[in-house]
Each structure stands twice: as structure tokens, then as C-alpha cells.
């Protein structure tokens, strides 16, 4: 069973993502900011990280930059953005994100992104 770390400061987004991912037979853990996510990545391996950009404490971008400095098997990273964050996509891909998805996302789009990064 693959596992996904859902990183978002919105409890509602985490809940929606969890629901979709579990329906795709993926085990889910949640982090509420980049720092929390980094700690969890140091403690357990994840196949994929679904990553929000704007979060308190540590942003998605800072998480991406620090992920490469910790000594773990690197998860695939799908960066989540809103239409307002379109300009962030290039920066996220440059910083090592594998794919991106626009919010609000649905099951079909998330499934196709997970296929594109080879998780399912
Ligand atoms: Mg956010």
C-alpha cells in the first residue's frame, strides 16, 4: 500500500484529500505546515507528498528546499496551488516538485497526477 503525506494548513482541504486518496487505496497521514511535514518525513518514508504553498510556520517552498537536505528516500512531490498562485508553479518545479495540481482538485485530476508521478 502506498502512502501519502497531505500537507495543508486547511483542515477542510486535508479532509477532502484524505477522502480521495483513501478511495484510491492510499494510506494517508497529515501535516499542518512545512515544519510538521519535514519532521514526519524524517521519521517515516512517504511515497508522495501533496504540498500546499501558503502555510504558517513553514511554507511549501521552504519545505521543498529543506527536503533535499534531509537524508531520506525522496518522496514524489505534488504541489497544490490556486489560480492566484500560478506564478508559483515554475518556482515549485525548479525547487524539485514533480507535478502540480490546481485547487480545488477532484478525484479524477488527483488520480491522473498520481499516475503521472508513478505512485499509482
Ligand atoms: Mg494554505
Q: Language-model segments: what does each one mean?
A:
Residues 15-23:
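Charged docking surfaces used in two-component/phosphorelay signaling
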Residues 25-32, 40:
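Short hydrophobic/Thr-rich beta-strand motif most characteristic of the beta2 strand and flanking loop
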Residues 33-36, 59-65:
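Acidic catalytic/metal-coordinating carboxylates
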Residues 45-50:
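Active-site beta3 strand of CheY-like receiver
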Residues 55:
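Receiver (REC) domain active-site loop signature in two-component systems and cognate sites
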Residues 62, 84-99:
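Alpha4 helix (beta4-alpha4-beta5 surface) of REC/receiver domains from two-component response regulators
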Residues 87, 105-114:
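C-terminal output helix
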Amino acid at each position: 500500500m502506498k502512502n501519502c503525506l497531505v500537507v495543508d494548513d486547511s483542515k477542510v482541504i486535508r479532509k477532502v484529500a484524505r477522502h480521495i486518496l483513501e478511495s484510491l487505496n492510499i494510506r494517508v497521514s497529515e501535516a499542518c505546515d512545512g515544519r510538521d511535514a519535514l519532521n514526519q518525513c524524517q521519521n517515516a518514508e512517504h511515497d508522495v507528498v501533496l504540498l500546499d504553498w501558503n502555510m504558517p510556520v513553514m511554507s511549501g517552498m521552504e519545505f521543498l528546499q529543506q527536503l533535499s537536505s534531509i537524508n531520506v528516500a525522496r518522496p514524489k512531490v505534488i504541489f497544490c496551488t490556486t489560480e492566484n498562485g500560478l506564478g508559483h508553479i515554475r518556482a515549485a518545479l525548479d525547487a524539485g516538485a514533480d507535478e502540480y495540481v490546481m485547487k480545488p482538485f477532484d478525484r479524477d485530476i488527483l488520480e491522473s497526477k498520481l499516475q503521472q508521478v508513478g505512485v499509482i
